[in-house]
Amino acid sequence: MWNKQKQNIYAFIDSQNLNLGTSLNIKKKGMVVYKGWKLDMKKFYRYLSDKFRVTKAFLFIGYIPQNKKMYDSFRNFGYELVFKPTVIDHDGKAKGNIDAEIVLYASCLKLNEYDEAVFVSGDGDFYCLYEFLQKKGKLKNIIIPNRYSESSLLNKFWVYKIFLYREKSKLERK
């Protein structure tokens, strides 16, 4: 009898890129070319598990004490949260840039624990990480919230790209 070992597939999620990439309207020349929508994070976790066979999903997020209930909900859905302290920017908004944490986790801290990785971000800042993991045979997919906010640096990785807006009907919070 043939025995296939289960693969460990980890998801590394840029929460801010996911949130803004799905929820904000995008205009070009005064016309709305992308209508934002509310992503259901519980459905999204199931989507990652079912479609990509993700065994662990890391949600990288800036920590704001008032959002504790939301964080608890994310944990209950199955996400492992990785927090970054936030600072207040000049506009009075909390900012917690998590790019370095994603790179650290994916390329060092968790590298030997997973067979393949799925990334959720349209950010070109991860270009060198994707190249590194591609050479190691560990890059499975890059899920991009919408095609209008993805970095052109990701063009090289077209075979890995999945556009989340195409799954809106399945993943939208009603």
Residue ranges, per PLM feature:
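Nuclease catalytic cores that cleave nucleic-acid phosphodiester bonds
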Residues: 65-174
